[in-house]
Amino acid sequence: MNTYLDLCRFILQKGSFRNDRTNTGTKSVFGYQMRFNLEEGFPLLTTKKMNLRSIIHELLWFLKGDTNICYLVQNNVNIWNEWPYQKYQQSAFFQNETLKEFLEKIKNDPLFAIKHGNLGPVYGKQWRDFNGVDQIKFLISEIKTNPNSRRLILNSWNPPLLNQMALPPCHVLIQFYVHQGKLSLQLYQRSGDVFLGIPFNIASYSLLLMMVAQVTNLQPYEFIHTLGDAHIYSNHLAQVQTQIQRTPKKLPQMILNPDIKNIDDFKFSDFTLQNYQCDGILKGDIAV
């Protein structure tokens, strides 16, 4: 994954310090592209240990059209917890619960989860019901019947609903491309947290590419990741400096259950990662 480390080095060398919405501060560049050939292995970062379980569960959650953190919390996936908890803290229902206590209520009290666990019409809602359109169903049908189309688009940016979302989509637009029996996917990401988010996004959208390729009888080929504002938060600079000193290892292989022919039939047990060798964990706080 030298491709990713090159991005880190580029930002460290060429980036500008900027203020941001979270008041954390970033070092940032605008406009950057990375390419990952899935025939060379599954692009899961090896210069720090990645939480693949969270990546898979979040992607399945998107594909279910779900927007409530309850499923994620029940599967010990914590990447979306801060946003509904922050909203709950500002509500009249807040009784000084800690984040841990809040999550226990989400996990064990269905009515509480319905009321306080929803993120608004975020990714899953837009993927499966964009103003009445199931974009995933349409995409798969189009790839099968009209593979040369230049309209194989998945869009998460729905302007009238942005202010109802806990966080407007960062990974905004996806385009698929079919050539000689191979399927590629390009993601445009308006904003990318290079230390925490980007490695997660690379693996997630590469996995989505593999899933869609399987159910459309194509071979997964290339994931292209195009970034708008690519930034390293100021409180992640030390971790990134550590990471770029590490030597990438050979990429692992991701095996999908070959019996799955429908995108909605995938479950967590249908994914097997083989030969993953990595360096140790590098932690960093998420900016909310």
Swiss-Prot record:
Superkingdom = Bacteria
| GO process terms (BP) | dTMP biosynthetic process; dTTP biosynthetic process; methylation
Q: Which UniProt keywords apply?
A: Cytoplasm, Methyltransferase, Nucleotide biosynthesis, Transferase
Named from the GO MF annotations, one term is: thymidylate synthase activity
Q: Say yes or no: keyword Phosphoprotein present.
A: no
Location in the cell: Cytoplasm
The job of this chain, per UniProt, is described as: Catalyzes the reductive methylation of 2'-deoxyuridine-5'-monophosphate (dUMP) to 2'-deoxythymidine-5'-monophosphate (dTMP) while utilizing 5,10-methylenetetrahydrofolate (mTHF) as the methyl donor and reductant in the reaction, yielding dihydrofolate (DHF) as a by-product. This enzymatic reaction provides an intracellular de novo source of dTMP, an essential precursor for DNA biosynthesis.
Q: What is its main location?
A: cytoplasm
Show which residues constitute the signal peptide. none
Q: Which family does it belong to?
A: Belongs to the thymidylate synthase family. Bacterial-type ThyA subfamily.
The UniProt annotation places (6R)-5,10-methylene-5,6,7,8-tetrahydrofolate binding at N51, D193, A287
Q: How does it assemble?
A: Homodimer.
Asked if the Swiss-Prot or TrEMBL record annotates the protein with the keyword Thylakoid, the reply is no
* Gene that encodes it: thyA
Name the UniProt record assigns to this protein = Thymidylate synthase
Any one Pfam family here would be Thymidylat_synt
Alphabetized CDD domains for the sequence: TS_Pyrimidine_HMase
Q: Which residues bind dUMP?
A: R21, R150, R151, R190, S191, G192, D193, N201, H231, I232, Y233
**Pathway entry:** Pyrimidine metabolism; dTTP biosynthesis
Q: What is its EC number?
A: 2.1.1.45
Give the catalysed reaction(s), semicolon-separated: dUMP + (6R)-5,10-methylene-5,6,7,8-tetrahydrofolate = 7,8-dihydrofolate + dTMP
Task: Report the GO terms under cellular component.
Answer: cytosol
**Active-site residues annotated for this sequence:** C170
Enzyme class, UniProt record, top EC level? transferase
The record's annotation in SUPFAM superfamilies points to: Thymidylate synthase/dCMP hydroxymethylase
| Organism ancestry | Bacteria, Bacillati, Mycoplasmatota, Mollicutes, Acholeplasmatales
